[in-house]
């Protein structure tokens, strides 16, 4: 099971009742965050989730509304008795940007590890999360992220017994490690079924609608996508500032064959996003104009 919370939905600046866009997930005791603008830690507190388990923070880009909340968050995590390293992921220049922000958060009781993205597409494995970062089309270098939880196949008990593999060795095989018994090697594929469908969340803000987004969002259980503009007549402005309209996001969701899309990163001028979602739903019916704190528990297919 993967818990997903859209902490905030605002673009550019926080508003009363609308924090800056940020995502947080929880899986197997580890939390991951994408973006951390001003006030993000307040949104975490309002949700009631813990700071200490945050193991990974990914940044889409370095505009202030996506990273300016980091110093305060780091201090709060430090005050939660965290000692193990925290991994930060983002476009090239991450170390320099974070060092500048840490002028006001110089002492932390844990190490920061940096992963700087330089390629069009990169894959990372961190704390049980399979992360695919992909470069999108914004005014500055910007990445989207797909977060996947893979699921191995079922262990074939009868096959293991037939092969004479002792029960004490089963756990290793289930976790992908070969075992040797009486000079004979047994590999996981001998007793494991085909991989089962996992879980996938794709997150993209601050971009024009480009093919790489729908390619990476393909068959996501949840697609969280910016909808900067919902009103008619905003297409030219979206192109000029390299953002998206509700209908452009809906077309990406349709092309990617996702299960559900949450719109986020609304323009401050968009007071009631839900009033403009109907046109997007004509393109992709499972479109939701998300509000702050919207949460879902994504379950594997046989978990009900």
Curated annotation (Swiss-Prot):
- InterPro entries the UniProt entry points to: Metallo-B-lactamas, RibonucZ/Hydroxyglut_hydro, RNase_Z/BN
Q: Where is the signal peptide?
A: none
Q: Where is the active site?
A: 65 (proton acceptor)
Select a single GO molecular function from the record's annotations and give it: zinc ion binding
Q: Which residues are listed for Zn(2+) 1 binding in this entry?
A: 61, 63, 138, 206
- EC assignment: 3.1.26.11
Residue sites binding Zn(2+) 2 per the record: 65-66, 206, 265
Q: What does this protein do?
A: Zinc phosphodiesterase, which displays some tRNA 3'-processing endonuclease activity. Probably involved in tRNA maturation, by removing a 3'-trailer from precursor tRNA.
Family the entry assigns: Belongs to the RNase Z family.
What's the protein name?
Ribonuclease Z
What are the top taxonomic ranks of the organism?
Bacteria, Bacillati, Bacillota, Clostridia, Lachnospirales
């Amino acid at each position: 099971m993967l818990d997903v919370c859209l902490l905030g939905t605002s673009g550019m600046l926080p508003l009363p009742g609308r924090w800056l866009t940020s995502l947080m997930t929880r899986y197997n005791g580890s939390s991951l965050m994408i973006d951390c603008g001003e006030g993000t830690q307040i949104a975490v507190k309002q949700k009631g989730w813990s700071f200490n388990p945050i193991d990974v923070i990914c940044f889409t880009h370095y505009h202030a509304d996506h990273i300016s909340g980091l110093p305060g968050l780091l201090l709060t995590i430090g005050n939660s008795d965290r000692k193990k390293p925290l991994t930060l992921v983002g476009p090239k220049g991450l170390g320099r940007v974070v060092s500048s922000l840490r002028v006001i958060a110089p002492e932390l009781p844990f190490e920061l590890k940096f992963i700087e993205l330089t390629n069009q597409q990169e894959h990372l494995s961190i704390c049980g999360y399979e992360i695919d970062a992909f470069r999108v089309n914004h005014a500055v270098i910007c990445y989207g992220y797909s977060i996947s939880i893979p699921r191995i196949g079922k262990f074939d008990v009868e096959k293991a017994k037939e092969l004479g593999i002792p029960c004490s060795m089963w756990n290793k095989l289930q976790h992908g490690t070969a075992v040797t018994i009486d000079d004979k090697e047994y590999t996981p594929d001998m007793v494991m079924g085909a991989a089962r469908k996992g879980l996938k969340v794709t997150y993209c803000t601050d971009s024009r609608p480009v093919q790489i987004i729908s390619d990476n969002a393909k068959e996501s259980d949840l697609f969280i996508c910016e909808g900067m503009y919902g009103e008619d007549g905003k297409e030219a402005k979206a192109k000029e500032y390299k953002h998206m309209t509700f209908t452009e996001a809906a077309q990406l969701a349709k092309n990617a064959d996702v299960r559900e899309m949450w719109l986020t990163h609304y323009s401050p001028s968009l007071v009631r996003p839900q009033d403009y979602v109907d046109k997007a739903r004509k393109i992709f019916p499972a479109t939701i104009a998300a509000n702050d704190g919207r949460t879902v528990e994504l379950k594997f297919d046989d978990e009900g």
